[in-house]
Every structure is written in structure tokens, then in C-alpha cells.
């Protein structure tokens, strides 16, 4: 249990003391995890409860001089908050100016974060594709050399290429069943923990080098890393049979590092809201209406940017 996360997630009103502590957590260079969990907790507080301009302004005015990882969490969280409270925000000109100042401080980061939020709209399409492909191939699994087996693969080739090209979250399909452990079931904060190598101690000693090697090559979000450590012993046969070092290198090298980091936090939040029993809201469903929201207008500037985001929402 992370006391800082729980405190900021569950508090009703943000007192002056809470606000001062929040800023201290974000400014402490020696304890990055406390700041990251404070940001996650206050973000969830806003998303899961009622609108509070004071809480949002506390987040927005705490950005100066903080670590890049913390700022990335703030940008992603602020975008989801803007989506959730679009009606309250869109006519508040002063607040919109403050939001724009934060979101345009690092425009490439903000555009990448919004792109990754838009990209989540394709996950259900990807799930449907996988279900259909499995249903079609299952009767032929004992005869993989049949013409019919390869005809089906060829007929689905364009969709497979689309999934690869769009950098869709294929790891979600792999790891969604890994989140049933007590580690996630009993503690909401574990879904949003930053990665700590100490988690490798949960892996059998003879498997630790293998898991560490996978983590070095596989661009997983932090909660997927924890899930892998929790469940590796049960699934290592499947993992070893399906993955190769070359394929993992290709996936990792194909995406810029800043996109992997930002996308990782988007994926952590997506897993929390989609898979966790600790929450009842689904803020990522609002991404289907992204073009109608103020966050889209603030971030998507120019035809090329519009075309890029709209392609993800198609």
C-alpha cells in the first residue's frame, strides 16, 4: 500500500497543508516515487470524484523544476481530466490559458501523449480482430500446412500490418490475464507504481536473468513489468515459445524512447481503468469523442497533426 497515493486519491477537500505537501513531494529529487504517486493519486481523485478547479490548479502550478517523468505524468493526467470535465473547462478562459501554458511547454510531448490516448480507441478493434482470427484458425490448428490455414492468414494480412504500423497496444492482449494476482487485486496503488528492480525478487532465482533480459528488450509499461514478474513462472513456456530476442529488439527500436515512456503511463492508466476492480469509471471511453473536446483543440495544431490523430480515431 502506498500511503501518499491513497491519501491524495481519497481526500475530500485539498487543504493548504495537503497542497504544500504535494509541492514538496514533486520537488524532492531524492524520492521520485513519492512525487509520481502523489501525481497519480491526485489525478485519480479528480477523475473519480467531483470537479475541483482548486485541485486542478494545484497540479498545474506545481510543474516548475520537476523531474521529466513527473511532468509526463502530469501532462497525461491533465488530458484525461480535461476530457472528463470538458463542459466545466471549455468556457473558463483563465483556466484554459493555464492549461495551454502547461500543455504547450513541451508540444512534442503533449502531442505524443494525446496520440497515445487516441490510440487506445483501437484496442477494442484489435481485440475483435484477435477473437475472429482465433475462431477461424482454431479448427485448423492441427493442420498448419493446409492451404486454408494460410489463406486465412493472407486474408488478414492487411489488418496485421495496420496493427503493427499504428503501434497499437498489443501487450494489452498478452498481459490482461496477468492482472488477477493479489498484488493488483488487493492494492490499487500497485497499478500505477513506477518500476523498481526489486520486483525481480518475486521471480524464481533461476529465471531472473531471463526476465531481466526480457525487460531490457521489451517496451512494457511499468504495470506490465510487475505483472510479468508476478506470473512468469506460470506462463514462461508460452512466453519463450512466442517471443524471440530479434522480435523484441525490433519492437523496441521501432518506437522513439520518449514515446515509449509517455505511452507507458497511458497504458498503465488504461489497464487500471479497464481491468481493475478498484474503480468504476472509464475515462478512456471519452477518447472516441476526442475531436469534439477542448483538449483536441489545444494540442492538435496544423493539418498534419490533425491527420495523424484522426487516423488513430478512424
Name each model-derived stretch.
Residues 1-29:
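N-terminal uDENN/longin-like adaptor modules and analogous extended polar/low-complexity scaffolding regions
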Residues 3-10, 35-43, 72-79, 109-119:
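Amphipathic alpha-helical elements of HEAT/ARM-like alpha-solenoid repeat scaffolds that form extended
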Residues 14-22, 34, 38, 51-58, ...:
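Structural recognition of alpha-solenoid helical scaffolds
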Residues 27-97, 314:
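Alpha-helical protein-protein interaction scaffolds
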Residues 60-67, 71, 75-79, 142, ...:
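Long, charge-dense low-complexity segments
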Residues 85-163:
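Eukaryote-biased recognition of long, low-complexity, charge-rich segments
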Residues 128, 148, 155, 162-179, ...:
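C-terminal regulatory domains involved in ligand/effector binding and gene-expression control
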Residues 199-314:
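Alpha-solenoid helical-repeat scaffolds
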Amino acid at each position: 500500500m502506498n500511503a501518499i497515493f491513497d491519501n491524495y486519491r481519497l481526500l475530500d477537500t485539498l487543504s493548504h497543508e495537503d497542497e504544500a505537501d504535494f509541492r514538496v513531494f514533486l520537488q524532492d529529487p531524492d524520492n521520485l516515487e513519492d512525487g509520481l504517486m502523489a501525481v497519480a493519486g491526485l489525478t485519480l481523485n479528480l477523475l473519480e470524484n467531483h470537479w475541483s478547479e482548486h485541485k486542478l490548479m494545484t497540479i498545474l502550478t506545481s510543474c516548475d523544476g520537476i523531474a521529466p517523468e513527473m511532468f509526463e505524468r502530469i501532462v497525461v493526467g491533465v488530458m484525461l481530466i480535461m476530457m472528463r470535465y470538458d463542459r466545466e473547462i471549455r468556457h473558463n478562459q483563465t483556466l484554459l490559458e493555464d492549461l495551454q501554458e502547461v500543455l504547450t511547454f513541451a508540444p512534442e510531448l503533449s502531442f505524443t501523449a494525446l496520440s497515445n490516448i487516441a490510440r487506445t480507441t483501437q484496442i477494442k478493434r484489435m481485440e475483435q480482430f484477435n477473437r475472429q482470427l482465433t475462431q477461424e484458425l482454431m479448427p485448423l490448428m492441427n493442420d498448419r500446412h493446409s492451404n486454408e490455414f494460410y489463406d486465412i492468414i493472407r486474408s488478414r494480412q492487411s489488418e496485421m500490418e495496420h496493427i503493427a504500423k499504428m503501434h497499437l497496444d498489443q501487450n494489452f492482449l498478452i498481459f490482461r490475464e496477468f492482472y488477477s494476482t493479489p498484488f493488483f487485486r488487493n492494492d490499487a496503488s500497485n497499478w500505477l507504481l513506477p518500476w523498481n528492480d526489486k520486483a525481480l525478487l518475486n521471480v524464481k532465482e533461476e529465471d531472473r536473468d531471463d526476465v531481466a533480459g526480457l525487460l531490457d528488450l521489451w517496451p512494457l509499461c511499468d504495470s506490465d513489468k510487475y505483472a510479468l514478474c508476478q506470473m512468469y513462472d506460470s506462463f514462461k513456456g508460452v512466453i519463450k515459445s512466442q517471443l524471440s530476442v530479434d522480435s523484441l529488439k525490433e519492437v523496441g527500436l521501432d518506437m522513439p524512447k520518449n514515446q515509449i515512456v509517455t505511452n507507458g503511463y497511458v497504458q498503465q492508466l488504461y489497464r487500471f481503468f479497464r481491468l481493475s476492480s478498484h474503480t468504476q469509471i472509464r475515462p478512456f471511453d471519452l477518447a472516441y469523442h476526442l475531436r469534439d473536446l477542448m483538449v483536441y483543440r489545444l494540442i492538435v495544431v496544423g493539418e498534419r497533426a490533425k491527420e495523424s490523430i484522426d487516423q488513430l480515431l478512424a
